[in-house]
Amino acid sequence: MSFFNFRKIFKLGSEKKKKQYEHVKRDLNPEDFWEIIGELGDGAFGKVYKAQNKETSVLAAAKVIDTKSEEELEDYMVEIDILASCDHPNIVKLLDAFYYENNLWILIEFCAGGAVDAVMLELERPLTESQIQVVCKQTLDALNYLHDNKIIHRDLKAGNILFTLDGDIKLADFGVSAKNTRTIQRRDSFIGTPYWMAPEVVMCETSKDRPYDYKADVWSLGITLIEMAEIEPPHHELNPMRVLLKIAKSEPPTLAQPSRWSSNFKDFLKKCLEKNVDARWTTSQLLQHPFVTVDSNKPIRELIAEAKAEVTEEVEDGKEEDEEEETENSLPIPASKRASSDLSIASSEEDKLSQNACILESVSEKTERSNSEDKLNSKILNEKPTTDEPEKAVEDINEHITDAQLEAMTELHDRTAVIKENEREKRPKLENLPDTEDQETVDINSVSEGKENNIMITLETNIEHNLKSEEEKDQEKQQMFENKLIKSEEIKDTILQTVDLVSQETGEKEANIQAVDSEVGLTKEDTQEKLGEDDKTQKDVISNTSDVIGTCEAADVAQKVDEDSAEDTQSNDGKEVVEVGQKLINKPMVGPEAGGTKEVPIKEIVEMNEIEEGKNKEQAINSSENIMDINEEPGTTEGEEITESSSTEEMEVRSVVADTDQKALGSEVQDASKVTTQIDKEKKEIPVSIKKEPEVTVVSQPTEPQPVLIPSININSDSGENKEEIGSLSKTETILPPESENPKENDNDSGTGSTADTSSIDLNLSISSFLSKTKDSGSISLQETRRQKKTLKKTRKFIVDGVEVSVTTSKIVTDSDSKTEELRFLRRQELRELRFLQKEEQRAQQQLNSKLQQQREQIFRRFEQEMMSKKRQYDQEIENLEKQQKQTIERLEQEHTNRLRDEAKRIKGEQEKELSKFQNMLKNRKKEVINEVEKAPKELRKELMKRRKEELAQSQHAQEQEFVQKQQQELDGSLKKIIQQQKAELANIERECLNNKQQLMRAREAAIWELEERHLQEKHQLLKQQLKDQYFMQRHQLLKRHEKETEQMQRYNQRLIEELKNRQTQERARLPKIQRSEAKTRMAMFKKSLRINSTATPDQDRDKIKQFAAQEEKRQKNERMAQHQKHENQMRDLQLQCEANVRELHQLQNEKCHLLVEHETQKLKELDEEHSQELKEWREKLRPRKKTLEEEFARKLQEQEVFFKMTGESECLNPSTQSRISKFYPIPSLHSTGS
């Protein structure tokens, strides 16, 4: 065991060294260097504090993040590295970073102006186009710098664009940004904020096949521009997770009101919001667009000055209005007054609130509907004595309007203070409207008063046709006239409205709106004629125009019996708010009683800012946007609920009148939005012209009930949702007549007046039948809202270019504001939850990627090790074989050498013996010759001896030489034979060794090929498993997102159910009070009708009263049952809707899961195909490798054979020469032998 393993087991040595980061200081307390001086907010991953450097006093935003481990610290290093590496005037700078006690402190440059979205919410309006241009230009510069440095921001939105006090912007929050290593590198992470996500980023939720690049930021920039133009991004009403499907499948979003914006702006958005990534412009291209050719940041400096201005708030309650209502409710009921028959429920305020129609009006009205307008006009003309004084009042008011407006225009350049009119000046005389320097008063309701009187004339004419006594008619006229005088005094309170004049035309339009609304039967031709004249107004509005708040106050004359009845038939306070500049006109949505004659005062407060006289005239509507919210869901506001119980007759008449009023209202509000007050050095005066409205004409009702188009306009001043261009009421509610309610009453209401002669009970039931249909649908909500409502007045004072400017805005604080704030808070919570989820997913993805990369590295290392091991094994075997062969050859050679030596010695010994024998034989031959010579004669003996010796010597020498040569040849032959045998043996051994070596090499290559194939299989299995792991994690993350989405949906549904339960509880609690008040009113009206038509005896009257009381009790019981049934239906419908939403959500989730599974199957199939192709290519390359190897083996065998053949032929080619071995053993020559 090595020492390191030993140390690991016993945990010896130091702990793992902490990783050091370049820009993060460790083990230093940041509070030693920075002082916390305040809290800026609570971010998604920690709190953000305002800090100041103790040495340099530099301010910073300190983001403190609690990190539980070093691994979590890694998640924030990308953000810190990006902040540290960026040096651009439009990107926040990193000032310091600490890691201390498991807290990561990131201190970045402090931007005192705050985020763009926070500024819009503070000012309660979007940015103007000039402001958007500056923000867009500087943001583009920052993005271009980031993209040039290979950085994708991935979370661009208004909340991450910060203002400085100098009017510049800085891009912040790089928490989910990506820093690439290559310019063309792409990303496939599903990360960012849903509303601003590009479609290609959304697609990465289920498919990683099409990664995205830097152009994803360009899409987010386009969405951010829409957000700055409309306060909220597109699809903001959707759940953060459900919006993803909308982005992926729908067309690119556009501006809600395109006509308000320049063509350059719209073209710029089109270039940004291009779903085709290749066609989408880059930041460098967008910088050349004419929309961003701006240099001055003055619009932003003005915006910041206003946002950071000193604000004084004043909260005003509506107590005075309640007192007026109580006074009105305490007035005596004229004999000629009675509950109206709901002639129309068009969207006018007077039609919704006034309910003082003449008695018997419904029947006579029905009779007269079939008549022509000429007859109606003639009846109106016949009533001149009744209308003289109101007409004079109208003329009087018009004169005062002109005076007040002219005086206002001459003094408009002075700073104007807003003075609350009704609280300080109670009941001034109608003939003496005050014209003061501090309070310009404009009577915008005088025309409406005249029209109201016309309606009253018509209704009184109808009364005269149905009454039988001239005395009773005179009494009614007298009471009517007295009531009008009282009403005129009341109207004086409400029409004396203090107006810091926006323009004379604005007041005119408001008057026109009221006049149109008061004329129930106004024909379309008259309306169009009036609109044609009114459309000639200017189209600029001063920036910083303060809010105008119109409130509707009225009480039904039929409800003036007691204070309890004051809550009966007040229409709903569903507000129609149209913002012109910063102008709000609150109008109830739908009213239950529309045919009455009571004038509805409109309280209109316009507060004018002090504006530099030499200021550019073209500063227009840009600083205060026109906003119109159009709700398309019926029943979402209390005012809309009224339509559920309205009668068929109401629908029939309303279908015409509402259409007329809609057109008039739409066009006039549009005109009002274009009005401007231009203040230049010449102080031009604007002439005043208020037109009288044409006389009232009643439109004959259609024979069939028609759908009613009622514009449901609701402004949310905080959110600015569903903005529409003012005047273009493109979205309306289609309200169909309720066919299932009281078919008998429908027949009665659509009759021709014959019911007037039958009985007073039936008559009164017919008249009052409409009243019961609207009580349970929130008819007193306006009054309750008025009691609860408060007006919040904000005054901002700031200095722009050395000029002090004061902007005063008024806003009615209602429950909807708190609900909007609550919804915004909940939406922020949902986005924060999503951000946490994305951070966890990113961390899990990084961990998985690291794990998979480690697995790949490990398997590739193992492959390499196995290959090296296998090669080493066979190389070792071959080496051993070669070593063994070498040793064998050496041993054989040694053996052969020894054998050759021994054989040569043996042969030499034998030859020496034979030579010795041969020499002995020659000696003996010599002796024989001597003996022969001795036998010869003595004299011849000497000579013969000599001759015979010479002959013998020559003969013996030749024989000996031949014998020795023969012996040498025999020796060489024997040795050569031995050598040949040795060579053959060596050749065999070498051939065998070569064969063995080649077999080993074949085995080595086969093993390598097998190993390669196995590695390919294992690599494929690993990649397949990794792909499954990746998709498993994607499915897991998708399911977690779906769980979170389902949880949010359930919370949302639960909120809806709770709201409905609370509303129904309030309605149930209100109903008994409404019924008691209504019962008193109806009983009083019934008794009065009995007194007027007193032809029966007192007993009969008492019986009728009892019968009426029984019918009333029955009717109230039916009302309670109808309300109960309605509540059950509402709850059932809501539950069904919630269930449908959940089903739809689950369906979308299942589609996403199915899509993910499809992608996984497709990727696995592609992986298998890639593996098959790779294996096929490998096998195709394997054949040439085998062939090459065999050819190499054959060549080596051939070379070996040639070598040994040549060696065999080269040895002993000349037998006469001594062999290589025998020459070392020389044969003794003749000289060595003695004689």
From Swiss-Prot:
Keywords: Apoptosis, ATP-binding, Coiled coil, Cytoplasm, Kinase, Nucleotide-binding, Phosphoprotein, Serine/threonine-protein kinase, Transferase
EC category name: transferase
Subcellular location, record wording: Cytoplasm
Stretches with biased composition (Low complexity): 749-760
InterPro entries, per database record: Kinase-like_dom_sf, PKK, Prot_kinase_dom, Protein_kinase_ATP_BS, Ser/Thr_kinase_AS, STE20_Ser/Thr_Kinases, UVR_dom
Residues of the active site: 155
Superkingdom as given in the UniProt entry: Eukaryota
Pfam families: Pkinase, PKK
Chain segments carrying region Disordered: 309-351, 363-393, 421-441, 519-539, 613-760
Family, as annotated: Belongs to the protein kinase superfamily. STE Ser/Thr protein kinase family. STE20 subfamily.
The protein's name: STE20-like serine/threonine-protein kinase
Organism of derivation: Homo sapiens (Human)
Source lineage: Eukaryota, Metazoa, Chordata, Craniata, Vertebrata
